[in-house]
């Protein structure tokens, strides 16, 4: 069963309301995605903890329809410095 980029975006925004979220279906099959999640909730957290926050937001979708998810998780300040 596939999941849409819009559904992924909505789940992340529900858990991290301040987040700017961009999601791409990298294969067109609804199971491989790349996402950039920019949130102040990431301030003071390392990459693993940032990813855990996103995985928690996606819940059971990480064990089901999402097979692969490439994440970029900058804070707003880190994103502005790019």
For each feature predicted by the language model, list its residue ranges.
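N-terminal first-folded block
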Residues: 1-30
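Short loop/turn motifs enriched for small/polar and acidic residues
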Residues: 26, 38, 72-76
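Short, active-site-adjacent cap segments at secondary-structure transitions
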Residues: 29-31, 78-79
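Short connector loops at helix/strand junctions that flank enzyme active sites
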Residues: 30-32, 37, 64-66
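A short interface-forming secondary-structure element
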Residues: 34-49
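C-terminal structural segments of small proteins and small subunits
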Residues: 51-82
